[in-house]
Amino acid sequence: RLKEYPFQKGDNLHENLRRIIRDILPEYEAYPYKIVGITIGIYGVVQQNQILFTPYYPLPDFNLAKLLESEFHIPVFVENESNLSVLGESAFHHYDQNMVLLNIHDGIGMGIMINGHLYRGQDGYAGEIGHTILFPDGKPCPCGNHGCLEQYASEKAILEEYARLTHQEQVTIDAFVRDYQNQVPEALEMMELFSKYISI
């Protein structure tokens, strides 16, 4: 069951997660095993259940998994959302031992599975494809570099550039897709650019 819990800028992450978990727990009391574990997916780098780096929002430096485990007495796992996506695809859809999954949203992430095992690389950075530098003197990125792929080919970057090209304050993904399907020249141009950047 999917349920949304909107977060506002400046919200206390730990308090919000505690509230969400407290809200969900009673729903599973009647089940034989109740809740056997909690997984938290984040946009960022995770190693050994510890958040190392998040480019788009600051996360507290405490051990989130341990804090929640000690309070709720349930195993808590923190993982990069692209890694979770490739695990989900492998487990529930394709059953492949070797696969790569691209996640494109505000950033660009990659989940990598080799011989049935998640591949994280050194310090968990293997899937951070969005921070491949396309243009060394390009747009600044929250990671601290300039010209990263996700500053040009992420959903966020495409919509911002399309809004600029079409003199709009903001464009939704639905509006962009509609314009592309209707062959609006600027939308076609943006998709051409996206295809070029993402295939480099």
Where are these regions (language model features)?
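Glycine-rich phosphate-binding loop of actin/hexokinase-like ATP-binding domains
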Residues: Q97-Y152
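Adenine-nucleotide phosphate-binding core of ATP-dependent small-molecule kinases
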Residues: K9-Y31, L149-Y152, A157-I200
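Glycine-rich phosphate-binding loop and adjoining helix at the ATP-binding site
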Residues: L2-P26, A30-N98
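Conserved short-loop catalytic and cofactor-binding motifs
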Residues: Y5, L52-Y56, H146, R178-D179, ...
